[in-house]
Amino acid sequence: MSIQPGINETFKEAEALYTEQSNAWALAAENLRDVQSRMRAAEYEMELIEGFTRLSPEVMAGKNSEERSAQVLLAVDADVAYSAFWQERETSRQLVARWQDEAMLARDKMAKAKRVMDYCIALVNWRATKGGESDG
């Protein structure tokens, strides 16, 4: 049985698109996991910083002026880190949304390519069946 060149080419194009989108989906999923992991690590780091830099009167009361100054400087550093954390968190949220969108788009394209491949196979099988019936 010979497959018509048009069907064969269409199948190969759909197969290549499927493979390409499968790779794109895998990359998007990997990037998504990476961003989410970094977000969790940053949240944990911020919890630690917040715990070390509390400026409650109880904490400050037992310290001499040098210790209080150091504690205030640490709190200022923590405040800067906290601002950076929230900016990074917003950037990470945008990246998460981007990678989720890219993964969904790749999955949609994979599904379309799969339908084209299935259609090509069905068409070839149908033609083979029709050809076999007319020969018999």
Feature names for model-found ranges:
Residues 1-30:
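Short, charge-rich amphipathic alpha-helices with coiled-coil/heptad character
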Residues 32-74:
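Extended alpha-helical coiled-coil "stalk/arm" regions
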Residues 129-136:
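Short acidic DE-rich linear segments
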